[in-house]
Amino acid sequence: MTCMNPRGHGALRAFAHPTGSAFVIVVAATIAAHVAALAQNLDIKRYNPSEWTKGRFSEVVTVTGAGKTIYLAGVGAEDENAPAGASAPIRHLGNPYEQCRYAYDKIKRLLATHGASLADAVKQVVYVTDVRFQADVAKCRREAYGDGPIPANTFLVINALAIPGMLLEIDVTAVVAK
Protein backbone atom coordinates (compact mmCIF):
# COMPACT_ATOMS: atom_id res chain seq x y z
CA MET A 1 0.00 0.00 0.00
CA THR A 2 1.27 3.49 -0.78
CA CYS A 3 1.38 6.04 2.01
CA MET A 4 1.52 9.72 1.27
CA ASN A 5 4.32 11.74 2.76
CA PRO A 6 3.56 15.26 4.10
CA ARG A 7 4.00 16.81 0.64
CA GLY A 8 1.39 14.53 -0.92
CA HIS A 9 3.80 12.35 -2.89
CA GLY A 10 3.11 8.65 -2.85
CA ALA A 11 6.81 7.75 -2.82
CA LEU A 12 6.87 6.08 0.59
CA ARG A 13 5.85 2.45 0.79
CA ALA A 14 4.88 1.05 4.18
CA PHE A 15 2.53 -1.35 5.84
CA ALA A 16 -0.79 0.36 6.40
CA HIS A 17 -3.86 -0.88 8.17
CA PRO A 18 -7.42 0.16 7.29
CA THR A 19 -7.74 1.98 10.62
CA GLY A 20 -4.80 4.21 9.70
CA SER A 21 -2.15 5.74 11.90
CA ALA A 22 -3.90 4.83 15.17
CA PHE A 23 -3.02 1.20 14.47
CA VAL A 24 0.65 2.09 13.92
CA ILE A 25 0.71 4.02 17.20
CA VAL A 26 -0.80 1.08 19.09
CA VAL A 27 1.72 -1.35 17.57
CA ALA A 28 4.62 0.98 18.38
CA ALA A 29 3.40 1.41 21.96
CA THR A 30 3.02 -2.36 22.35
CA ILE A 31 6.56 -2.96 21.11
CA ALA A 32 7.93 -0.23 23.38
CA ALA A 33 6.11 -1.73 26.39
CA HIS A 34 7.45 -5.20 25.56
CA VAL A 35 11.03 -3.92 25.26
CA ALA A 36 10.66 -2.02 28.55
CA ALA A 37 9.33 -5.17 30.25
CA LEU A 38 12.26 -7.20 28.95
CA ALA A 39 14.70 -4.58 30.23
CA GLN A 40 13.05 -4.65 33.66
CA ASN A 41 13.39 -8.45 33.77
CA LEU A 42 17.14 -8.34 33.19
CA ASP A 43 19.44 -8.83 36.13
CA ILE A 44 23.00 -7.67 35.47
CA LYS A 45 25.68 -8.72 37.96
CA ARG A 46 29.42 -8.13 38.01
CA TYR A 47 32.01 -10.34 39.74
CA ASN A 48 35.69 -10.12 40.63
CA PRO A 49 36.99 -13.41 42.06
CA SER A 50 40.60 -12.17 41.88
CA GLU A 51 41.45 -9.55 44.49
CA TRP A 52 43.83 -7.59 42.25
CA THR A 53 41.06 -6.81 39.71
CA LYS A 54 38.62 -5.24 42.18
CA GLY A 55 37.98 -1.62 41.30
CA ARG A 56 39.77 -2.01 37.96
CA PHE A 57 37.32 -3.98 35.80
CA SER A 58 34.77 -6.77 36.05
CA GLU A 59 36.19 -10.21 35.39
CA VAL A 60 32.73 -11.66 34.79
CA VAL A 61 29.42 -10.00 33.94
CA THR A 62 26.23 -12.06 33.83
CA VAL A 63 22.95 -10.94 32.29
CA THR A 64 19.95 -13.00 33.32
CA GLY A 65 16.62 -12.73 31.55
CA ALA A 66 15.14 -15.53 29.47
CA GLY A 67 18.58 -17.06 29.83
CA LYS A 68 21.81 -15.96 31.43
CA THR A 69 24.58 -14.42 29.36
CA ILE A 70 28.04 -14.52 30.90
CA TYR A 71 30.69 -12.08 29.70
CA LEU A 72 34.26 -12.79 30.76
CA ALA A 73 36.79 -9.99 30.65
CA GLY A 74 40.01 -10.81 28.86
CA VAL A 75 41.62 -13.77 30.60
CA GLY A 76 45.34 -14.34 30.31
CA ALA A 77 48.12 -15.79 32.39
CA GLU A 78 47.75 -13.25 35.21
CA ASP A 79 48.13 -14.92 38.58
CA GLU A 80 44.63 -14.67 40.05
CA ASN A 81 46.05 -15.00 43.55
CA ALA A 82 47.81 -11.62 43.42
CA PRO A 83 46.75 -9.25 46.23
CA ALA A 84 44.24 -6.44 45.71
CA GLY A 85 45.71 -3.28 44.21
CA ALA A 86 48.78 -5.07 42.87
CA SER A 87 49.60 -5.73 39.26
CA ALA A 88 49.27 -9.48 38.85
CA PRO A 89 52.44 -11.36 37.97
CA ILE A 90 52.30 -13.29 34.71
CA ARG A 91 52.72 -17.05 34.79
CA HIS A 92 54.65 -18.95 32.11
CA LEU A 93 56.64 -15.96 30.82
CA GLY A 94 57.66 -16.35 27.19
CA ASN A 95 55.55 -19.48 26.61
CA PRO A 96 52.36 -18.79 24.62
CA TYR A 97 51.13 -22.39 24.78
CA GLU A 98 51.36 -22.60 28.59
CA GLN A 99 49.88 -19.10 28.98
CA CYS A 100 46.97 -20.24 26.81
CA ARG A 101 46.46 -23.43 28.84
CA TYR A 102 46.52 -21.42 32.07
CA ALA A 103 44.01 -18.93 30.60
CA TYR A 104 41.60 -21.70 29.56
CA ASP A 105 41.87 -23.30 33.00
CA LYS A 106 40.84 -19.97 34.52
CA ILE A 107 38.06 -19.55 31.94
CA LYS A 108 36.65 -22.98 32.80
CA ARG A 109 36.65 -22.14 36.52
CA LEU A 110 35.04 -18.73 35.96
CA LEU A 111 32.31 -20.24 33.77
CA ALA A 112 31.69 -23.10 36.23
CA THR A 113 31.17 -20.57 39.02
CA HIS A 114 28.21 -19.26 37.01
CA GLY A 115 26.74 -22.61 35.95
CA ALA A 116 28.38 -22.76 32.53
CA SER A 117 31.15 -24.56 30.70
CA LEU A 118 33.07 -24.06 27.48
CA ALA A 119 30.24 -25.93 25.75
CA ASP A 120 28.07 -22.87 26.51
CA ALA A 121 30.51 -20.41 24.94
CA VAL A 122 29.01 -18.63 21.94
CA LYS A 123 31.78 -16.13 21.15
CA GLN A 124 35.44 -15.71 21.93
CA VAL A 125 38.09 -13.22 20.93
CA VAL A 126 41.75 -14.20 21.22
CA TYR A 127 44.33 -11.41 21.33
CA VAL A 128 47.99 -12.28 20.78
CA THR A 129 51.08 -10.11 20.63
CA ASP A 130 52.72 -12.10 17.83
CA VAL A 131 51.14 -13.89 14.86
CA ARG A 132 53.65 -16.73 15.36
CA PHE A 133 51.63 -17.77 18.45
CA GLN A 134 48.71 -18.83 16.25
CA ALA A 135 49.70 -22.52 16.07
CA ASP A 136 50.23 -22.76 19.85
CA VAL A 137 46.90 -21.06 20.52
CA ALA A 138 45.06 -23.24 17.99
CA LYS A 139 46.46 -26.41 19.62
CA CYS A 140 45.59 -25.13 23.10
CA ARG A 141 42.06 -24.15 22.01
CA ARG A 142 41.45 -27.59 20.45
CA GLU A 143 42.57 -29.23 23.70
CA ALA A 144 40.39 -26.90 25.80
CA TYR A 145 37.20 -27.48 23.77
CA GLY A 146 37.89 -31.14 23.01
CA ASP A 147 35.00 -32.66 21.08
CA GLY A 148 32.58 -30.02 22.36
CA PRO A 149 31.05 -27.21 20.35
CA ILE A 150 33.42 -24.43 19.31
CA PRO A 151 32.14 -20.84 19.53
CA ALA A 152 32.42 -18.10 16.97
CA ASN A 153 36.03 -16.95 17.20
CA THR A 154 38.04 -13.87 16.32
CA PHE A 155 41.86 -14.00 16.41
CA LEU A 156 43.60 -10.62 16.64
CA VAL A 157 47.27 -9.69 16.63
CA ILE A 158 47.94 -6.56 18.68
CA ASN A 159 51.02 -4.61 19.78
CA ALA A 160 50.79 -5.22 23.52
CA LEU A 161 48.53 -6.30 26.36
CA ALA A 162 47.87 -4.63 29.70
CA ILE A 163 50.60 -6.31 31.74
CA PRO A 164 54.17 -6.78 30.48
CA GLY A 165 54.85 -10.44 29.77
CA MET A 166 51.28 -11.24 28.69
CA LEU A 167 51.42 -12.92 25.31
CA LEU A 168 47.70 -13.54 24.89
CA GLU A 169 44.30 -12.75 26.30
CA ILE A 170 40.96 -14.47 25.66
CA ASP A 171 37.47 -12.91 25.94
CA VAL A 172 34.60 -15.39 26.20
CA THR A 173 30.84 -14.91 26.09
CA ALA A 174 28.63 -17.83 27.13
CA VAL A 175 24.86 -18.32 27.38
CA VAL A 176 23.02 -20.77 29.63
CA ALA A 177 19.34 -21.52 30.07
CA LYS A 178 17.74 -19.97 33.11
Residue map of PLM features:
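N-terminal presequence-like segments and the immediate start of the first folded domain
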Residues: F23-D105, R109-K123, T129-K178
